[in-house]
């Protein structure tokens, strides 16, 4: 539980650990955690559809990025966001060079999150706010979990305002900053929405 400091009838959360302390602590845990800048937050497990969608994202991006100097990484790759927060998105793309032992990935250009029944608010509001604050991130893609479709938040350069665009299964995700286009349906190959 984080320490609380009361001042003028307002409670302020004090960090229970620093980002570096969290990164060291998280390595020794059996469960996966993110860090909200104040305390560790347990990450929930996903469904078969969630796993399949993530694999499809990695495959689609890796195939298209091969030889470009950019690469896609999965949910073990951390992103430093606002304050001391650390997020582990379902997929990210970076074109930066960094050591293989890096705990936080620099130069992240695109971030992908697959929604789950419990992550909607965090993915659409909290993480969007955090990812928008990272200058290198140009695209944040939130994929639906009940049907094939996504919302992409993007900015044409590191300083412009963000724009949101919803895409259906029949459309394609254009990522000019990476020089690639991916049909939305490709992210949902072998995903069974019956019962979703």
Protein language model regions, located:
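Gly/Pro/Ser/Thr-rich low-complexity, intrinsically disordered segments predominantly at protein N-termini
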Residues: 1-196
